[in-house]
Amino acid sequence: KIIYFGKSIEQRMNGTCAGGTGAFLDQMASLLNTDTAGLNELAKGYQTIYPIASRCGVFAKTDVQPLLNEGAAKEDIAVSILQAVVNQTISGLACGRPIRGNVAFLGGPLTYIPELRKRFVETLHLTPEQTIVPEEAHLLVAKGACLDAKDMTPISVEKLKSKIQVLRQSHDTTTQPLKPLFTTNAEYEEFKTRHE
């Protein structure tokens, strides 16, 4: 996830797959017969970074397995996996928008895998002054949510349903909604029958 702070807050999140997440890193580490702590240790001793896909764990595995078969150093594969996460985050989430200024590294993988942070810092050419690694960075988002919710007034389920209904009825003039695939249950049932 990337959050840009400017005149307004812009959040960008990967909604397509697990590439770049802790689960992805766990899966890649298992290919090297280690865990994420071991992946971090291996990455410290690298010589070469290889291109590896991180869009999807399956694609990444098809890049990692041949490297293992060809005898590439596990250190090089480990750092290449971390660099793949960096590349995916920058290209897939930033989508060409520069990542500038101070950068705070939050969340589990960025807390527990310092070599991943290092890859981001080097790739983004961040200075030590621009690099922010808060204490308990893995908990900072949860703490923020608690602080934000502290002054909120609880509402009933009925009131929440009412608010959701109002949102559904509001019209966003910047986008045109798509027509529903089926306007009635009968149309849906006919579709299911046709495609069984």
Predicted regions and their residues:
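Active-site nucleophile and cofactor-binding loops and adjacent substrate-binding regions
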Residues: 12-20, 80-82, 109-110, 132-141
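Glycine-rich phosphate-binding loop plus the immediately following alpha-helix
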Residues: 9-48, 138, 147-151
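Glycine-rich phosphate-binding loops at beta-strand->alpha-helix junctions
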Residues: 94-123, 134-138
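Adenine-nucleotide phosphate-binding core of ATP-dependent small-molecule kinases
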Residues: 60-91
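Flexible inter-domain linker/hinge segments
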Residues: 152-196
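Glycine-rich phosphate-binding/hydrolytic loop that grips phosphoryl groups
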Residues: 25-26, 133-170
